[in-house]
Each structure stands twice: as C-alpha cells, then as structure tokens.
C-alpha cells in the first residue's frame, strides 16, 4: 500500500522533553470526556483497553505536517488536542479492530507505539483498493494514508492521533493594547509580536517529586524550585484534566488565547535579586528560589511570574499539558 511511512520517534521529533513525555507520561493520564466527536468515533473493538487522553504534542504535530506537506503538497493539522490511547495484549488472539467508524473524509491517522522495549505489534491496514501489513516496534511512528481502516496484532500500547488538511492557522491576535498580557499554548503566538516594544516569554510548571518553575523571559532563563509548602499547593490535582474542553472548532469553540491585565500582573508578584539567586514570591502560592542566566529585568520577570500564579490558581484549557507539567507562551509590552 502506497503512503504508509514508519519513522523512529527520535528521528521524527527533534525535542527531547516531548520525546520523554511521549515515552513516559501517557500511561498515567486520566480519561477525558469533553472531546471532539471524531475522536470519540474511533471504534476500538476486541479486548483492548482504551482511554481518551489529552495529547498536546506541538513538535510531533509540526513534524507530521512537514511529512504530509512533502507527500500531498498541502498543510495538515490536528483535528483535536486529544488522542485515543489503547493497550493491546493479544499474541494468540484474533486481531483487535481499530478504525474510524464513520470514516470522515481526508482523515490521516498517525499511530505512535509506546510501552516496553520488547513490545511489538503488526498493523493490518486496509482501504477500498489495497491492503498492507506493517510491523511497529516500540517508539516507532506510523503515518497512514487517508481513509483507511486498520487492525492490530501483538503487544503494544498505541497513541492514535487524527490529522486533516487545513489552511494556514488564523491569527491568534485581532486587537491588542499596551496593557494586555496575552497567553496561549500555541507557540505561534510568539510570531505575532505586535512591535519591538513587546517581549516574549515561556512558562513551564512541573510538579512531581518537587515543583519546578521554568521561565524564559525576553531571552533570560530562570529555573526555580519551590519550597515544600509551595510544592504542596502546586501539586494538588496536577493531573486533573477533566474540565478541559476540546478546541476542535466543530464541537467545541474555546478561545485559544487569554488576555490578562498588565498592571495586575505587574503588581501580582515580587522578586528580589541577591548574590546567590532570585527570590520570587507569589501571594497565596508561595516562594521560589531561582537561578538565572541572562539579564535581570524585574518588571518583565514579575509579569511572567504572575502569569505562572494565574496558571496555578486556574488550571483550565488554556495551558498545554505535558505529563506532570503544563506550559504557556506569552507576550506583553515592556
């Protein structure tokens, strides 16, 4: 069958943190309900276990888009930020059927095999005119043609992503003022910087055995570790994704950005530089001690820090999710 392409995960995705997320974090994710109907309509038969999970994978999405652009000369994008996660254990059983029941036109399935190194399964792929069998070892990615059904046989855990053809993404910004602070999980927000009087920032909050705040503010890098009390506040319900709606634009129409007040963000936190580190304080959350590489710009840091506090207090659909962490891209006026 023409059009079936298999890649090693490490060769396709050039981002170490996202690769580790794919390899290690998906089996811990809780099921999500507010999901695009096209994802829900992936029919999973047999005795396999399955779940619908959040799958914010921007580097994987870009890599698949590049491959499909070279094949079809068209751009593709994810139908949904969610994915189907299935676990198959059927060495000697009838192949487990996995296919899109309604077969929407021009859907491109992408299958990622995760789990143990020794896991291997076969994809039995069929269309109206041909069929093929592809072996999929652990940490391999199969990009399938449009309008196919497939069955699986063997042992594996698979992530099923759905893509379709798209035009260029609409701009995230329409009108802004200098008192706006704008955040989104989409990196392309940084490409829409209104002027040189604005700066970019990136925030990642991870909470596992300890809580870590990682910020890049106008090129300066900060790595902050929370004290025990602050860690307890941040880690509470860190995996709660149950209230997140999809943003597929066919079933759910959530805004892709949030606009915050710059003055509130500027006054919503404090930071102080000493000879050892930057001490950061978020009211009602706690304190962080941070290392720093780059120029110390207290106002910019306070704005980004207050955005981090906003994320801790309000865990909704705006930030991207990556295992035990969440992240946003942001812009604000200097």
From Swiss-Prot:
InterPro entries per UniProt: Poxvirus_A51
Top-rank taxon, per record: Viruses
Induction profile: Expressed in the early phase of the viral replicative cycle.
Assigned keywords, A-Z: Early protein
Family: Belongs to the orthopoxvirus OPG181 family.
Name recorded for this polypeptide: Protein OPG181
Organism of this sequence: Vaccinia virus (strain Copenhagen)
Gene that this polypeptide is encoded by: OPG181
